[in-house]
Curated annotation (Swiss-Prot):
Protein name: Augurin-A
Principal cellular location given in the protein's record: secreted
Keywords carried by this UniProt record: Cell membrane, Cleavage on pair of basic residues, Cytoplasm, Membrane, Secreted, Signal
UniProt record, GO biological process: anaphase-promoting complex-dependent catabolic process; cellular senescence; central nervous system development; G1 to G0 transition; negative regulation of cell population proliferation; regulation of cell population proliferation; response to wounding
Database matches in Pfam families: Augurin
Gene Ontology cellular-component annotations: apical plasma membrane; cytoplasm; extracellular space
PANTHER family assigned to the protein according to its UniProt record, in alphabetical order: AUGURIN (PTHR31613:SF2)
Disulfide-linked positions: none
Similarity annotation: Belongs to the augurin family.
InterPro entries: Augurin
């Protein structure tokens, strides 16, 4: 009985090896076929696809970005602020400079965004005052 099982397993193994050896080894695998680039004859060369330099320059020069203001001048309250500021003797350039300064000052003093240390470092900050306790620690940008 043992020899019968042994012969059956041996026969199955030999059949499997024969089937594997008869398959065409030289043929490419499916992965290689997927990775190979198809060469199509109807693909245009890169020079035919590219736009002429004059057309490209014409397109790029037509794009003019409007000057970015820190406030919306169409709002009546903003217009009133500008008028009051100019009435005090300042010009609009000075107003824009001051607004940029104070907005930047506010951004830099925001403890949620200000980091004096690498928050992903293995060793935290040394000083107890520099460590920020609370819900905004390390979760500010998510």
């Amino acid at each position: 009985m043992l020899s019968e099982k042994f012969h059956l397993r041996l026969l199955t193994l030999l059949t499997l090896l024969t089937a594997l050896s008869l398959t065409d080894v030289a043929s490419e695998s499916k992965l290689e076929k997927l990775l190979m680039k198809r060469v199509d004859r109807d693909v245009k060369p890169a020079a035919a696809v590219a736009v002429s330099p004059s057309k490209a320059k014409e397109f790029l020069t037509s794009l003019k970005r409007p000057k970015r203001n820190l406030w919306d001048r169409s709002r009546p309250d903003v217009q009133q602020w500008i008028q009051q500021f100019m009435y005090m003797g300042f010009d609009e350039a000075r107003l824009e400079t001051d607004l940029a300064y104070w907005m930047d000052q506010h951004r830099s003093s925001d403890q949620g965004r200000q980091h004096h240390y690498d928050e992903n470092a293995a060793l935290g900050p040394r000083g107890a005052a520099s460590y920020r306790h609370g819900a905004n620690v390390n979760y500010d940008y998510y």
